[in-house]
Swiss-Prot record:
It is a single-pass membrane protein. Gene3D superfamilies: 2-enoyl-CoA Hydratase, Chain A, domain 1, 6.20.330.10. Its main location: membrane. Pfam families: Peptidase_S49. It is found in: Cell inner membrane. This is Protease 4. Belongs to the peptidase S49 family. The chain crosses the membrane at residues 25-45. GO terms for molecular function: serine-type peptidase activity. Homotetramer. The active site is at residues 209, 409.
């Protein structure tokens, strides 16, 4: 027995030594890892601070990923994280719209930057107002006498929109300019819910409030189809007008229609590159070697980089503007509006309201610009933000709303207290309506022999997804939705100096482009972020000003954790997608996007001012 106990004691002693060794090894490795991260960040910052062109050359706009108003990670820290952890998915990278525009404007006045090269092969998307704003900066750069060149093996619609602002567009002899138009695509679940015996209870106000249709239909309603066809057609016409004007051709020549394109391709034997050249979509067909030769002639040769002389946007150091004059606070509402604190890619009602409060209480802040790029979301969170913005205005601080790609439904709700609203012609706004959806599974459970029962002190207390909603609960829910809609209408009417009846005619969940919103009196003027800032300065009577962007900079630990998890997110989908046919990959991405939308539904009263179709444009 003593031998047995000695054996057991020895086993546990040996096990403890192994575990202790592993513990110490992990801690030491983690310490070394943190040292390497610190050194890497120091080197990155050091390189960034000396990254201005010391020799004359181009600014290479090699944008990778998507362009958003407010990235979740600083692009320099994000780049370092990808190098350290090997995240390879460009789709995960977010780029700041304002950093890009500021880089172009700084390059315009930088004597060492003699041109811009747009290399957009890894650029995966942005809303039209954002690209229009970048295009404005590119046009300013060109007007200064410096050229802009676009190079690409192929151009997607978004890539080509930006490329059209260049002096010259090169296309690979085997390439294509992929113009096909816009579409909205959503998933509809009625048959699935019926098969699962899920009971869907819908509460809504607004003829065109189609956000609930996926739960109660298998296709679009005629009203939703008519409404979406109108605004998506306007977006496409805006696209054609801008790009054709840049290329100095007619919209008809740019996109003559599906059959005409097929006929044109047939005439050149299916050669998409020749078709693009013949129709003046591009200026020249050239291999990568020929493009390199031309750019070397333009900008010179770098022996150290073994390429034409250029500095990447990601290495180009942005100067911090001097804090002169009064402060204009810039606060972002970027993404779906959720109750509570902010999460990456979403607007937290409490977080945004806190930022507005800080700006209101800061005596140095003379005006507020709220940059809205949101399809809406929680009514409760929207009201929290709106109330704080109204308090800022009541405190004597001018509030100007700058609308980005979307300021719809809840995004418009939070805009109502503004002194002035500026929208882009392609902004999607309006969608003034409210809905709620409650799903119960009593029939699903019953079909497999599971039943729910109990007692309650009133019908209002007996609420569970395992039981059918009582008539009393349904009646209260509908009354709450109707009150919310009346509240929405009243807020808009008071803000726009109209009657509730006048607003109701243009509400009902109707989505409007910025141009239509201006005609309907929902916004004050058409313009961009610069116009909104200028208006804020005018209202605050500032002759000089500087911008203070209210956004939390990620810590080193945030960057480490984000990059580590980002690597996993980047690699797993690619590994899975490699085994799937292309149509299934597209379907999987659509399902993921739908899931992300549903995850944003956390309103405590289950009331939403949300425009689902606004975020579905492809």
């Amino acid at each position: 027995m003593r031998t047995l106990w000695r054996f057991i004691a020895g086993f546990f002693k040996w096990t403890w030594r192994v575990l202790n060794f592993v513990r110490e090894m992990v801690l030491n490795l983690f310490f070394i890892f943190l040292v390497l991260v610190g050194v890497g960040i120091w080197m990155q910052i050091g390189n960034g601070s000396n990254s201005e062109q010391t020799a004359r050359g181009a600014l290479l706009l090699d944008i990778s990923g998507v362009i958003v108003d407010k990235p979740s990670t600083n692009h320099r820290l994000g780049a370092l994280g990808r190098q350290l952890f090997g995240a390879s998915s460009d789709r995960l990278q977010e780029n700041s719209l304002f950093d890009i525009v500021n880089a172009i404007r700084q390059a315009k006045d930088d004597r060492n930057i003699t041109g811009i090269v747009l290399d957009l092969k890894n650029f995966t998307g942005a809303d039209q107002p954002s690209m229009r704003y970048i295009g404005k900066a590119l046009r300013e750069f060109r007007d200064s006498g410096k050229p802009v060149f676009a190079v690409g093996e192929n151009y997607s619609q978004g890539q080509y929109y930006l490329a059209s602002f260049a002096n010259k567009i090169w296309l690979s002899p085997q390439g294509q300019v992929d113009l096909h138009g816009f579409a909205t695509n959503g998933l509809y679940y009625k048959t699935l819910l019926d098969k699962l015996k899920v009971s869907t209870h819908v509460f809504r106000v607004g003829t065109y409030k189609s956000a609930v249709e996926p739960f109660i239909r298998d296709d679009m309603s005629p009203a939703a189809r008519e409404a979406d066809s109108r605004w998506i057609g306007e977006l496409w016409q805006n696209y054609l007008h801008t790009v054709s004007a840049n290329r100095q051709i007619s919209p008809q020549q740019l996109f003559p229609g599906a059959q005409a394109i097929i006929d044109g391709l047939t005439s050149v034997g299916g050669d998409t590159a020749k078709y693009a050249l013949d129709h003046k979509l591009v200026d020249a067909l050239a291999s990568s070697a020929d493009v390199e030769k031309a750019l070397t002639k333009q900008f010179g040769w770098s022996k150290t980089e073994n390429n034409y002389r250029a500095i990447s946007y990601y290495d180009y150091s942005l100067k911090t503007p001097a804090d002169t004059g009064g402060t204009i606070a810039v606060i972002f509402a970027n993404g779906a509006i959720m109750d509570g604190e902010e999460t990456p890619g979403n607007v937290g009602g409490d977080t945004t309201a806190s930022q507005i409060r800080d700006a209101r209480l800061d005596p140095k802040v003379k005006a507020i610009v709220l940059r809205v790029n949101s399809p809406g979301g929680s009514v409760n969170a929207s009201e929290v933000i709106r109330a704080e913005l109204a308090a800022a205005r009541a405190a004597g601080k001018p509030v100007v709303v700058s609308m980005g790609g979307m300021a719809a439904s809840g995004g418009y709700w939070i805009s109502t207290p503004a002194n002035y609203i500026v929208a882009s012609p392609s902004t999607l706004t309006g969608s003034i309506g409210i809905f709620g959806v409650i799903n119960t599974v009593e029939n699903s459970l019953s079909s497999i022999g599971v039943h729910s029962d109990g007692v309650s002190t009133s019908p209002l207390a007996d609420i569970s997804m395992t039981k059918a909603l009582s008539p009393e609960v349904q009646q209260m829910m509908q009354l709450s939705i109707e009150y919310g809609y009346k509240r929405f209408i009243t807020l808009v009417a008071d803000a726009r100096k109209r009657t509730p009846e006048q607003i109701d005619k243009i509400a009902q969940g109707h989505v409007w482009t910025g141009e239509d919103a201006k005609a309907n009196g929902l916004v004050d003027s058409l313009g961009d972020f610069d116009d909104a800032v200028a208006k804020a300065a005018e209202l605050a009577k500032l002759k000089q000003w500087h911008l203070d962007y209210y956004q939390d900079e990620p810590t080193v630990l945030d960057m480490v954790m984000d990059s580590m998890t980002g690597s996993v997110r980047a690699m797993l989908p690619e590994a899975i997608q490699a085994m799937l046919p292309a149509p299934l990959v597209s379907a999987a991405n659509t399902v993921k996007a739908e899931g992300d939308k549903l995850a944003a539904f956390n309103d405590p009263q289950n009331r939403y001012a949300f425009c689902l179709t606004c975020a579905n444009v492809r």
